[in-house]
Amino acid sequence: CSSDLLYAKKNHNNPLATSFLPTTRAEMDKLGWDQCDVILVSGDAYIDSPFIGVAVVGRMLEKLGYKVGIIGQPDYESDKDIKRLGEPRLYWGVSGGSIDSMVANYTATKKFRNSDDYTPGGKNNKRPDRAVLVYTNLIRRYFKDTVPIVLGGIEASLRRVTHYDYWQNKLKKPILFDSKADILIYGMGEIALMQLTTAINNKTDYKDIR
């Protein structure tokens, strides 16, 4: 990861060491940013904690010198949230959140859950079913011909290959086909994401990563 560290040494100025990663245009302006390098979209509210995958990934990329913004639980019926940080320079990162959205929204008997520990107030009214698909489609709808969309997190990881869908009682294709995203990183993907970010930043073909 020497190129990552070199990028960090050249570009890293850490005004965020004791604050949150930006979630609004006003917060970006306060940091003097015209554009984020990476925007992470999550089915959870943004909690700056080592227990939250998106926060960990965001802080890791920040330490390497990249400008990272986070959109937590965007409104999926309008453009007001997904467009508030603009378009990233390198890629979008999309996660359904810390819990698979279908598990977060329904019990094993398919009854809707009224509570969500990762939503402000604890009320389950912010996370859509199949959040990864919804957020990816939201980006595609409002940003035509955008930079790559990278999927990660438990929801995408569990659906990375052909799989049985309990909710629809049928086999489903890998989520990359249904979502029309570009890349999927599964499991503990910090190293892979570092390599991917370096490749995209250096304008090299990420398909050659091994």
Regions found by a protein language model. Name each.
Residues L6-G32:
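Short N-terminal or domain-adjacent regulatory/targeting segments
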Residues A45, G53, G72-R210:
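Glycine-rich beta-alpha loop elements in corrinoid/cobalamin-binding modules
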